Curated annotation (Swiss-Prot):
Family under the similarity heading: Belongs to the BRINP family.
Glycosylation sites: 168, 337, 456, 562, 609, 641
Tissue occurrence: Expressed in olfactory bulb, cerebellum and neuronal layers in hippocampus.
Name of the gene this protein is made from: Brinp3
InterPro entries xref list: BRINP, Growth_fac_rcpt_cys_sf, MACPF
Residue ranges constituting the MACPF domain according to the UniProt record: 74-264
Protein name stated in the entry: BMP/retinoic acid-inducible neural-specific protein 3
Organism: Rattus norvegicus (Rat)
Amino acid sequence: MIWRRRAGAELSSLMALWEWIVLSLHCWVLAVAAVSDQHATSPFDWLLSDKGPFHRSQEYTDFVDRSRQGFSTRYKIYREFGRWKVNNLAVERRNFLGSPLPLAPEFFRNIRLLGRRPTLQQITENLIKKYGTHFLLSATLGGEESLTIFVDKRKLSKRPEGSETSTNSSSVTLETLHQLAASYFIDRDSTLRRLHHIQIASTAIKVTETRTGPLGCSNYDNLDSVSSVLVQSPENKIQLQGLQVLLPDYLQERFVQAALSYIACNSEGEFICKENDCWCLCGPKFPECNCPSMDIQAMEENLLRITETWKAYNSDFEDSDEFKFFMKRLPMNYFLNTSTIMHLWTMDSNFQRRYEQLENSMKQLFLKAHRIVHKLFSLSKRCHKQPLISLPRQRTSTYWLTRIQSFLYCNENGLLGSFSEETHSCTCPNDQVVCTAFLPCTVGDASACLTCAPDNRTRCGTCNTGYMLSQGLCKPEVAESTDHYIGFETDLQDLEMKYLLQKTDRRIEVHAIFISNDMRLNSWFDPSWRKRMLLTLKSNKYKSSLVHMILGLSLQICLTKNSTLEPVLAVYINPFGGSHSESWFMPVSESSFPDWERTKLDLPLQCYNWTLTLGNKWKTFFETVHIYLRSRIKANGPNSNESIYYEPLEFIDPSRNLGYMKINNIQVFGYSMHFDPEAIRDLILQLDYPYTQGSQDSALLQLLEIRDRVNKLSPPGQRRLDLFSCLLRHRLKLSTSEVVRIQSALQAFNAKLPNTVDYDTTKLCS
């Protein structure tokens, strides 16, 4: 005998016989048994679509209807009674000495009518639709009784309209339903009355009772007179076998294909699996067989319900007592930026817990939405028309900080706008401005107010250190111009400066005094030993009202004919004095520092112009330039393209005459700037004896600017040189203790100023 059975079990048994698809499809029955919005996503999500006879079963139809109505939880309690164990001996007889199968002649006739090469449609019409896809091997007959409760948790948590707090209908909880379900088999009648009363009063539950077979009879004395039913449970399993085992070998594979197409594709197409993905190859009459429109529509409706729930969660958060109490505690006498609100937020533990509750609810909601969206894309990937998906954006703490600002500053005249901290303005509904309130002053560091004015909170009352109050605003206490103390810039533009340096124009030459005990200008000398020379301005004696800036250096060096000597120059700069010990070495050709440029002159001798161009980028103060001249011998290396240099004293033949050298002239290019030492001394005197209130701060600001501008012109290096101390020591003739006191006062004052960063310097002058 052949038994029909629900397609979920049919599919699991049938697939076990099709070897190439076994590993891919073993999870189908598990997916069918899961809740629609919680099952694991896989290439076979389409199995839960409206395809095949499985979706025509009563149990699944009830399940889908309840799910679409919002019933998200199901409680089921049941008991069963198994009396008779039945077995099918058809397969056993076939394997026993070739005995004929005890099958109906009609079944054999339909097999013969199929022929040797039937189409899938012929197999479906002649076998599957008449006899099903499986037959029963063994089962248990008996009876069962069950109670199923579908619960809508959202409606269950809401109190019925018009009900009082003391009524029983308003106190229904999940615990109550648990207790009622557990008492069903103890006191069936009273339990059903109670459940039906709750179902009518709250519409939050749906109750279904099933009683079949002998167990469902009220009179247990006459069990044999009641027709038994198949009992399926972990203890009483139904064993099915695919119908193809009863067919000839040439029909078995085609039958499996036809059965899968019938179950999975509802006979609207051919079932195909490829690369771990399965779908239906639709027939011409059913172009949308892969598109489960009903399931897609249900999921879109679920997304709409999620959007409504999302709005309700946010609205409940704004209407909560914790949110309202937090808003009342916010200070109104100064402007609250998002950082300040966040700090106050972290201080309110009740408000934090309420926000965490909102976050947890939102996370669960968005996880559910993402599962639905993933499933929706999976089901609709072969639809001709893709679904439109719109989900609300997740609101972070930054959104709520701006939302709180909107409640504070954009909530006038019954209109709520949106506040922007960047523009410090409100965007009101319908492009109006009536929602904007008067914004209080901003309290903070730097140019922000120290306090707001008590009579008008939109204006500053007091300011921070380094700022002054002007017309209700805090403006920086800008130091007066330092140009009358010391100059820094020239009127020449960069291009003009570059042109004059290239031409070695005498208009930018600084006339310095040449001093050397080792040599004289325009005189030949033996270059075997190091020669020392210097160019000094002696400003303390001759130019006390000027400081000088070096832009370049030029030397004209001549050698005797056929000389292999190569001049090597080392340059040291003393910014405001004359000694070598307080000079810094010029890093020629290191990193991005300029290198010497040699230009051959049209003279009988080997004469070259050696030019070092600093320009505006590398310009610096100078008082004395120390130049050390060494020479080396240039010889050809082992390779013709290489050159080897020797020191003259290290040459193989020290007695050999290496030639002579002379320097025709040395020029320093730069410019001189105004310098008033007496005015700076008077400025320093105000640190101890201020003229008026506030003049000490003004003097400190001016000295800070002079210090920073002087030190900014220090040579390149990891740390700046302390040129300002050299200026105080050599040009103002201050003692070491006075210099230390002034530097300490400037550092202490600079630390009080807002948004300032002090820097470390390297001492140059003792």
